[in-house]
Amino acid sequence: MNQAILQLSEIEKAFPGVKALDKASLNVYPGRVMALMGENGAGKSTLMKVLTGIYSRDAGEIVYQGQPAQFKGPRDSQQAGISIIHQELNLIRELTIAENIFLGREITSAFGRIDWPQMYAEADKLLARLKVKHSSKTLLGQLSLGEQQMVEIAKALSFESKVIIMDEPTDALTDTETEALFSVIRELREQGCGIVYISHRLKEIFEICDDITVLRDGKFIGQCEVVQTDEDGLIEMMVGRKLEEQYPRIDVVHGQTCLEVIGLTGSGVHDVSFTLKRGEILGISGLMGAGRTELMKVIYGALPSERGVINLDNRTINPVSPQDGLANGIAYISEDRKGDGLVLGLSVKENMSLCALDKLSKGVQIQHQDEVVAVDDFIQLFNIKTPSREQIIGNLSGGNQQKVAIAKGLMTKPKVLILDEPTRGVDVGAKKEIYQLINKFKAEGMSIILVSSEMPEVLGMSDRILVMHEGRITGEFEAKHADQEKLMACAVGKKVSEEAA
């Protein structure tokens, strides 16, 4: 193995009430892809922020290209040849793709004016390299979340970096977009670029990475080549224990029908009908753009419906806003927790109780003691890792933020809980905790809709599964009669009956 192009040795970083990094180490080698693994809260993101100068380090050493390094901020590290593609998009929807890629370093002519033809041409080359079928003159806001992620990757590629850090880069990508990204990673590897690949998708780690570094509780646990381990061994390194069963589904006797949707049409949804019983988990599967999220938002009131009927507990409802949906007993946990679900500048307590203030008030007065008790109960129940309920939620790991988002929905005491990609960007340990919580609500008789792009998750946790394609239901199965092949056939528009299956 070559000499490391980047070495982080025994890095330490503490925040009030928590030691985020405790002698964490990472080596990055030219022409190799290093997976950085660990549960949420293990210190992966903090280590990357120390590297790029967002946080100062308390102790430890960074060596880059054989020289000690201490970057003053992301721009400094970027100019030195280290780019980071963040899990959360750092783009401006109102600008074009090209303007986003070259923001702050626009290509100019000899007279100091922006050379638009040259800038668009360079941006188009980057998009073609990633197989993005859009002109760089397109406004970013017109792109899907997955396409926007590819623009973020194109932006990093434009720096011709020697080290590229990818934090959950495929989280919002389709299979086609993921394969295009992997092609680019292989190309960069051949060119001698060192890549840090942060992902919770173990299948991707074994497909694209050469080496693995594992952190746990801010500590360096170990480094090995991918060929020296397997999924079980890697999980045990990450969580410090064996995960006996990935999807701990429980059997519950279903009650009466709680939710009935008949001929629902609107906002990318066409003539959808289904029922949901008490104590049932209904999985919704399909490819990106199939209309799953749109269907949930129409039911919840976040998108308008054109026609159709929604019955909740034998009463017809017509939610015209999210507040209306909540008032009727429907809670929706968004796939975009930072865009739709949480206010990052507020505390854990404020976020959790935000939608339930009417239930925590008497008249116009909020009962703060009741609020504190309810929030503390959820922090304990959900095992949310936070120094206190007053901690700003933006400082928490992704998995703990997701737990707060789910608790926020449950604070409203809903009849129907809609979970849209509840484990996206969440490590295997936190996933298991979320699955156990879902089972707890199911056992208590709550009606749950689980929307997920991960077919094993839908198959493993659901009682019944609907598959969508182009806004329509193309398949319905009892989970015990379904498999990935049947779900995929329906997801691409092929009608598959359960009997034929």
From Swiss-Prot:
- E.C. number, please? 7.5.2.7
PROSITE patterns to which the protein is assigned, alphabetical: ABC_TRANSPORTER_1, ABC_TRANSPORTER_2, RBSA
| Family matches, as SMART domains | AAA
Q: Which residues bind ATP?
A: G38, E39, N40, G41, A42, G43, K44, S45
Keyword entries, A-Z:
ATP-binding, Cell inner membrane, Cell membrane, Membrane, Nucleotide-binding, Repeat, Sugar transport, Translocase, Transport
Superkingdom, natural source: Bacteria
Q: Where is the signal peptide?
A: none
The terms describing its cellular component in GO are: plasma membrane
Q: Where in the cell is it found?
A: Cell inner membrane
| A molecular function (GO) term | ATP binding
Q: Name one Pfam family in it.
A: ABC_tran
The UniProt entry lists membrane topology as:
Peripheral membrane protein
- Please report the stretch or stretches of sequence annotated as the ABC transporter domain: 6-242, 253-495
**CDD domains the UniProt entry points to:** ABC_Carb_Monos_I, ABC_Carb_Monos_II
What's its top-level EC category? translocase
As its record notes, the protein acts as a catalyst of: D-ribose(out) + ATP + H2O = D-ribose(in) + ADP + phosphate + H(+)
Q: Which NCBIfam families match?
A: PRK10762.1 (NF008030)
Subunit description: The complex is composed of an ATP-binding protein (RbsA), two transmembrane proteins (RbsC) and a solute-binding protein (RbsB).
Return the similarity comment: Belongs to the ABC transporter superfamily. Ribose importer (TC 3.A.1.2.1) family.
Tell me, what does this protein do in biology? Part of the ABC transporter complex RbsABC involved in ribose import. Responsible for energy coupling to the transport system.
* Protein name, per record: Ribose import ATP-binding protein RbsA
